[in-house]
UniProtKB/Swiss-Prot annotation:
Belongs to the DnaB/DnaD family. NCBIfam families: DnaD_dom. Residues 267-287 are annotated as: Disordered. This is Uncharacterized phage-related protein Lin1244/Lin1753. InterPro entries: DnaD-like_sf (IPR034829), DnaD_dom (IPR006343), Lin1244/Lin1753-like_N (IPR025400). Gene3D superfamilies: DnaD domain-like (1.10.10.630).
Length: 305
């Protein structure tokens, strides 16, 4: 049986002037030395585990005990860390994990050319090519998919995904632990994320040869504005309009956000209301040309070619 995969780091880099960083200073100003100490302890915990750390009620209780801090104080400090972008808000809201772009850059730089390393795509803030460049033998996986055709090498890696929540188990039971953890995944995640990330959705349905650098940067901004799920919904709308460009996704998503849309259900309702209004106006003024859905997004004149 292969030796269990080591995912964490033994040490991590910390700038000597880290306490002068604006984000650090905000937390220290709000919460004093206790807040600063909690931040450092959190980074230690994250790097010792992976490039992220699960932050559910269980981890909060145990962490509060380890650092000898009242749990309410701990929650307040961590919430402010998320609020002021020390940790990514979108990934915390969706997956209850603590991570950031800086953490991921330092982590993947540190592990370098490890023989094998498995990475959950949904947890990544870095672009996939960046990760592969730093770690050529990386193995990507989806959080809510168990592939029946995983080869023997990957089967040895998969138990590492559940290490934080299941703890140490005998090597004999490692393969069973993978199935058990996948079955315990929250039903909400399974229902809401059947297609993985916005990047993968666009590549599979539109940009078959991959995203351009411009589109990739724009998509990053869109996900930070509307979140992964709403961005994918805007992609589907762009495809429905037969305007398969990232700028179209940008226009659709920003149009929703400008009207206070926060969920896919609200987006559908917005589209329904707009379409209903367009049809009503068309009946009241039959002499006018019927309004097309593209007008809502200011695409300009309809092409005839």
């Amino acid at each position: 049986m292969a030796r269990p995969l080591k995912e964490g780091l033994d040490y991590f880099p910390l700038d000597v002037d880290a306490d002068y960083d604006d984000k650090f200073q905000l937390i220290e100003t709000l919460h004093g030395p206790t807040g600063f100490a909690i931040m450092i302890k959190l980074f230690m915990k994250i790097y010792s585990q992976n490039f992220y750390y699960k932050w559910t009620e269980t981890e909060q209780i145990l962490f509060a005990k380890r650092v000898n801090v009242d749990i309410n104080t701990l929650k307040t400090v961590v919430n402010d860390c998320i609020k002021y972008d020390l940790f990514d808000n979108n990934l915390f809201s969706e997956f209850q994990i603590l991570t950031s772009l800086g953490v991921q850059e330092r982590y993947f730089t540190a592990i370098g050319r490890r023989k094998k390393q498995i990475v959950v795509l949904e947890y990544l803030l870095l672009d996939r090519p960046e990760v592969i460049n730093l770690c050529p033998k990386i193995v990507f996986a989806n959080i809510n998919v168990v592939n029946d055709d995983i080869n023997a090498e990957q089967e040895e890696l998969m138990p590492a995904l559940s290490a934080q929540t299941k703890g140490k188990e005998s090597k004999v039971n490692e393969s069973k632990a993978v199935v058990s953890e996948q079955e315990k995944l929250p039903e909400k995640i399974v229902k809401e994320k059947p297609t993985t990330t916005a990047y993968k959705f666009w590549e599979e349905n539109v940009a078959i040869t991959g995203l351009s650098e411009f589109d990739r940067e724009l998509l990053k901004k869109l996900i930070s504005l509307g979140g992964n799920e709403l961005t994918v919904h805007a992609m589907k709308k762009a495809i429905e309009l037969n305007r398969r460009r990232m700028k179209t996704v940008d226009t659709v998503l920003r149009g929703w956000l400008d009207n206070g849309v926060k969920t896919t259900a609200e987006a559908d309702e917005q589209e329904k209301n707009w379409n209903g209004g367009a049809k009503k106006n068309a009946r009241a003024e039959p002499a006018k040309q019927e309004i097309k859905i593209s007008d809502q997004y200011n695409f300009g004149a309809t092409r005839t070619d």
